[in-house]
């Protein structure tokens, strides 16, 4: 079986990290990148140096010419095309395209990549109409006739595996989620205009900012049994990466907190190994920086009021963990062909 050939549209936080994951994977080959807003030499700089995840150390990265990057001796074609219909993915050999601009998140817009020769598109964001898949939760529902999918959000990727384990073992009656979420690129460095979200316009590095999130409701799309049973909100906090989900649920089958811990630990060592983690050490957010798992349950941080009402805490590197799942979803789609 040959390598999985991927292209990336949008070389932002997720685009660059998906590239890092792909370039460190033996079964995946990055063949093309498109970004109309940055030059190839600047793309080299942005990829090589990363404030959060450190310098790229796995191969030399050089500029062959204005349309080609070299990772060691591996060429990657670079495009700078605004209209996704015009990106010649087929010529570059890209069969799977990661749509990571944050702009083309619905099916019709993402389908533009198919016109350029891509076979499948993975949207690295929630989508209002593309089917959403969370690896470890519902990727087995994917069928090869589906060409455009969403990898959901980083928060849904953290919450859904945890919710699945709890629901499968104890039954979730209802629940509320809060994500304490690191800063993202859409926030403001200083107070600025944000007509649709007034609080979101305040300085990211100086404030704890309440915000909305569809992550909890989206769990109902990947786990239909939980549709209408979960909702949530977000606090944006002044850290650059790593976030944490606080899930408070009422469960149907009475269980002690120890019982719940055992169920999560078993899942993390069994069917959800590599997706779900389990820790009992006294850790803080930076301890999870660079963790490739979607959801790392913090056994010491949770509490139970009684056998039916419990608060569960799970960490996630919202950049690196999510980027790994994008590539994992592509792997699954490739195997399903």
Curated annotation (Swiss-Prot):
NCBIfam families: GAPDH-I. SUPFAM superfamilies: Glyceraldehyde-3-phosphate dehydrogenase-like, C-terminal domain, NAD(P)-binding Rossmann-fold domains. Key enzyme in glycolysis that catalyzes the first step of the pathway by converting D-glyceraldehyde 3-phosphate (G3P) into 3-phospho-D-glyceroyl phosphate. Essential for the maintenance of cellular ATP levels and carbohydrate metabolism. Plants contain two types of GAPDH: cytosolic forms which participate in glycolysis and chloroplast forms which participate in photosynthesis. All the forms are encoded by distinct genes. One of its GO terms (cellular component) is protein-containing complex. The active site is at residue 154. It comes from the Eukaryota. This is Glyceraldehyde-3-phosphate dehydrogenase 1, cytosolic. It catalyses: D-glyceraldehyde 3-phosphate + phosphate + NAD(+) = (2R)-3-phospho-glyceroyl phosphate + NADH + H(+). It is an enzyme of class 1 (oxidoreductase). It comes from Zea mays (Maize). PROSITE patterns: GAPDH. The record marks 181 as: Activates thiol group during catalysis. Homotetramer. It is found in: Cytoplasm. NAD(+) binds at residues 13-14, 35, 82, 318. Its EC number is 1.2.1.12. GO terms for molecular function: glyceraldehyde-3-phosphate dehydrogenase (NAD+) (phosphorylating) activity; NAD+ binding; NADP binding; phosphate ion binding. Belongs to the glyceraldehyde-3-phosphate dehydrogenase family. Gene3D superfamilies: Dihydrodipicolinate Reductase, domain 2, NAD(P)-binding Rossmann-like Domain. Keywords: Cytoplasm, Glycolysis, NAD, Oxidoreductase. Pathway: Carbohydrate degradation; glycolysis; pyruvate from D-glyceraldehyde 3-phosphate: step 1/5. GO terms for biological process: glucose metabolic process; glycolytic process; response to light stimulus. D-glyceraldehyde 3-phosphate binds at residues 153-155, 184, 213-214, 236.
């Amino acid at each position: 079986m040959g390598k999985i050939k991927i292209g990336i549209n949008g070389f932002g936080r997720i685009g660059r990290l998906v590239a890092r994951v792909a370039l460190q994977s033996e079964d995946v080959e990055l063949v093309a990148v498109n970004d109309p807003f940055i030059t190839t030499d600047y793309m080299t700089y942005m990829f090589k140096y990363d404030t959060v995840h450190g310098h790229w150390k796995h191969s030399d990265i050089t500029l062959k010419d204005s349309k080609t990057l070299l990772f060691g001796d591996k060429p990657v074609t670079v495009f700078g095309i605004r209209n996704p219909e015009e990106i010649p993915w087929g010529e570059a050999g890209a069969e799977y395209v990661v749509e990571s601009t944050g702009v083309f998140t619905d099916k019709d817009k993402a389908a533009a990549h198919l016109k350029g020769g891509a076979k499948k598109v993975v949207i690295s964001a929630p989508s209002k109409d593309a089917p959403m898949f969370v690896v470890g939760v519902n990727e087995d529902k994917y069928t090869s006739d589906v060409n455009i999918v969403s990898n959901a959000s980083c928060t849904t990727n953290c919450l859904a595996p945890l919710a699945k384990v709890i629901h499968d073992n104890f039954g979730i009656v209802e629940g509320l989620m809060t994500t304490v979420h690191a800063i993202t690129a859409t926030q403001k460095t200083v107070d600025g205009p944000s007509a649709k979200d007034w609080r979101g316009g305040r300085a990211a590095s100086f404030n704890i900012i309440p915000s909305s999130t569809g992550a909890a409701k989206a769990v109902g799309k990947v786990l239909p049994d939980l549709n209408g049973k979960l909702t949530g909100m977000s606090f944006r906090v002044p850290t650059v990466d790593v976030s944490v989900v606080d899930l408070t649920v009422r469960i149907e089958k009475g269980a002690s907190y120890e019982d719940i811990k055992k169920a999560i630990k078993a899942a993390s060592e069994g069917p959800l190994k590599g997706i779900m983690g389990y820790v009992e050490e006294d850790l803080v957010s930076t301890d999870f920086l660079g963790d490739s798992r979607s959801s790392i349950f913090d056994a010491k941080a949770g509490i139970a009021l009684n056998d039916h009402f419990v608060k569960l805490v799970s960490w996630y590197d919202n950049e690196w963990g999510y980027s790994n799942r994008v590539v994992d979803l592509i792997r699954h789609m490739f195997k399903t062909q």
